[in-house]
Amino acid sequence: MPMTTPALSRRAFLGAAAAAPLAFSTALRGARDVPVGLELYSVRTELAKDLLATVAAVGRMGYQVVEFYAPYLDWTPETAKSVRKVLDDTGLTCHSTHNNGPSFTGDGLKKAIELNQTIGSHAIIMASAPRATGIDGWQRVADQLSSIAQQLKPLGMATGYHNHQIEWREVEGKRPMDVLAAGTPKDVILQFDVGTCLEVGADPIAWINANPGRIKSVHCKDWSAGTGYNVPFGEGAAPWKAIFDAVEKTGGVEYYLVEQETGAQSGGELPMVQRCLDNWKKLRA
């Protein structure tokens, strides 16, 4: 899909300029300073009540980055500008968004690009591929990601894929995650959800080491056999220190995103993500 209007070209230039320093500055800061953010699905109930106030509250807690999820595509341009102001006012940044199917075709892609550029995000991540069946289906997903990556590259932007459980289970003798990794160029991000990897018994360290430089962001979601996802980040079974070491030495991580699937039933979403951030600080001390 051509993106050649003068306004979009100007945005593309600005987007490229904004995105380029991230990896460079991360390398200069050192591994321990990789910023920590929040996948805003973790506060979805609060977000639905008051978008701007919830984002501001997350910033005041001390999170450095946020990632918006699929409903953001319903925003108007004015809403995106208001969100950007809150991000700037609280010192938050947004490097990526989670997206469903409409963000990857036609006018949906165009709108996703424009909204992401407004809020400073440079990566349009595919949140899942629920319709993919069989290895041929997963190869089509890889082909789609490759095509989107080509369209986004001149704009200083990227795409990527976020794993769930299904991508680790073999289909016709192959794991869909391996098909996606092998079938896409190296600039397609392999956003790593740790909890779902652990749930199905896959090896997180082996996956990171097999894909050097492609794990640009990590969803820090914990899991344990006894509680499933009903456990705060840092209190489950994930070997976080080994994971941090691998993604910082090999994976190419540029930012972390805490994701907490439970919260409203555990005293509230905002107190829960504060607890997760406190646990993060202990792990990184």
Predicted regions and their residues:
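Catalytic-core regions built around general acid/base machinery
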Residues: 79-89, 144-152, 243-246
